[in-house]
Amino acid sequence: MVGAKPVENGSDGGSSTGLLHGRYELGRLLGHGTFAKVYHARNIQTGKSVAMKVVGKEKVVKVGMVDQIKREISVMRMVKHPNIVELHEVMASKSKIYFAMELVRGGELFAKVAKGRLREDVARVYFQQLISAVDFCHSRGVYHRDLKPENLLLDEEGNLKVTDFGLSAFTEHLKQDGLLHTTCGTPAYVAPEVILKKGYDGAKADLWSCGVILFVLLAGYLPFQDDNLVNMYRKIYRGDFKCPGWLSSDARRLVTKLLDPNPNTRITIEKVMDSPWFKKQATRSRNEPVAATITTTEEDVDFLVHKSKEETETLNAFHIIALSEGFDLSPLFEEKKKEEKREMRFATSRPASSVISSLEEAARVGNKFDVRKSESRVRIEGKQNGRKGKLAVEAEIFAVAPSFVVVEVKKDHGDTLEYNNFCSTALRPALKDIFWTSTPA
């Protein structure tokens, strides 16, 4: 293989021939995420190409993701379906875990949507395949819990393939009330009942995510958007969105039923498959590539989700295979030369209690502040008046995934210069050891 990657010696899964476990020749890097790298690989015995995901054991253990890895392996072995990425085999060495997976060459569905919304007939084909895969998983007691366009790949014939089962749950994970209780999923696609953390039906939560995906395919932008995470959660909780005028009445009706914030009245997967919009037959043959997107017009610009160059560069065809990349929110905690941002947000793998302790530590500097706290909120307030009254800083903690929380810190009252000084002399030093940073595996 051209550009083949040498493999470590036999103590780490290689052999004297430089092959992984004597069978696989590693080629070019396809992508990487927080915990894994994905390489093109070839089985020299069969000549078959695969996507080889390489996960560092040390990183997995460090952030407590051993169970998540085991779960992903179990789920992918259980769900064999034409629209689900297949796991061929799993190998391990002293320091790494190797997943030999189906090589999906068509890239991410996200890349198509990024160019503009899809025609309804095109979106329908993808949505039919998505629902087929999701229904298959649910019939085997498996809930994906992180469905989004970045987790949907396309093969060379344009058929959809669902990937990334790292957050999946089994029926046996249900508590006595018959509900799941772990907050999982990427914020913009998370169902309102998941945000509330009061227990939820995994099948209904997956259908909400399918509704968001369908909206994105048809509209070209997210139904729930806000620069402020708290405000976005409020919109999700209320089901506060508007369908664009170009959607057909049947499509609008289905999206609205999928994005019902009440899980008890949300449409079921059986009724989705029986809906007029869903049942309409595709015009293309099985092997005909899906048609192109619709270029977004100027009047649509206000609705689009604009991504920075750096964000776009991370969204390669295999980045989402690398174990929950969506939760590496990479702290929005950058330095500013002259002043602090009024609002900061960062991710951490520490529990909420550790975050609260660090915030209390910041408040103790100089004995100038009082602290009020709950399980998910901290308010730091100055004991004495400043130039514009007492300085008040609020922090709110959101559980986004089992191993990660998002912390939002903002000035609630007082003088900006005093807030800047508090951030640089007390808040930053207290928080610097807890916010999450990542390096490729």
From Swiss-Prot:
GO MF, one annotated term: ATP binding
Reactions this protein catalyses: L-seryl-[protein] + ATP = O-phospho-L-seryl-[protein] + ADP + H(+); L-threonyl-[protein] + ATP = O-phospho-L-threonyl-[protein] + ADP + H(+)
Residue sites binding ATP per the record: L30, G31, H32, G33, T34, F35, A36, K37, V38, K53
Coiled-coil regions, chain positions: none
Gene Ontology, cellular component aspect: endoplasmic reticulum
Keyword Transit peptide among UniProt keywords: no
Region (PPI): 341-371
SMART domains on file: S_TKc
Domain Protein kinase: start-end pairs: 24-278
Region feature Activation loop, mapped onto this chain: 164-193
Family: Belongs to the protein kinase superfamily. CAMK Ser/Thr protein kinase family. SNF1 subfamily.
Function as written in the Swiss-Prot or TrEMBL entry: CIPK serine-threonine protein kinases interact with CBL proteins. Binding of a CBL protein to the regulatory NAF domain of CIPK protein lead to the activation of the kinase in a calcium-dependent manner. Downstream of CBL1, CBL2, CBL3 and CBL9, regulates by phosphorylation the K(+) conductance and uptake of AKT1. Binds to CBL4 to modulate AKT2 activity by promoting a kinase interaction-dependent but phosphorylation-independent translocation of the channel to the plasma membrane.
Domains (record comment): The activation loop within the kinase domain is the target of phosphorylation/activation by upstream protein kinases. The PPI motif mediates the interaction with the ABI (abscisic acid-insensitive) phosphatases.
Protein name: CBL-interacting serine/threonine-protein kinase 6
Annotated organism of origin: Arabidopsis thaliana
